A protein has these predicted regions:
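Short alpha-helical
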Residues: 11, 36, 62
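Thioredoxin-like thiol-disulfide oxidoreductase module
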Residues: 31-48, 73
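Non-catalytic, surface beta->alpha helical segment in thiol-disulfide oxidoreductase systems
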Residues: 56-74
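Local sequence-structure signature of Cys/Sec-based thiol-disulfide redox active-site neighborhoods
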Residues: 1-26
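Alpha-helical elements of the RecA-like P-loop NTPase motor core of helicases
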Residues: 14, 39, 69
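Conserved residues at beta->alpha junctions
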Residues: 7, 32, 58
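Conserved beta-strand scaffold positions in the cores of enzyme catalytic domains, especially
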Residues: 27-29, 60
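Structural micro-motif
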Residues: 45-55, 64-65
């Protein structure tokens, strides 16, 4: 399961969603100020500075570039 924590008007959030949809990955998209607050984000992703923040199988992996690298290693 992939969890994407994003925000509106975020090209890399959109790219992460598109990659997951295209490849048929099981994923959930959570949006800032709808599904979580900044404070909750920082609790779950200490040191987070950019969007999206992504978790794969319960492990924080980083942003879109890290998701793309994970995808290419499969």
């Amino acid at each position: 399961m992939i969890e994407i924590y994003g925000k509106p008007v975020c090209p890399y959030c959109d790219k992460a969603n598109q990659l997951c949809e295209r490849e048929g990955y099981e994923f959930v998209y959570r949006q800032l100020d709808v599904d979580f607050t900044r404070e909750e984000l920082f609790e779950q992703f200490p040191g987070a500075r950019t969007f999206p923040q992504i978790r794969v199988e319960g492990e924080n992996i980083g942003g879109y570039d890290q998701l793309y690298a994970w995808h290419n290693q499969k």
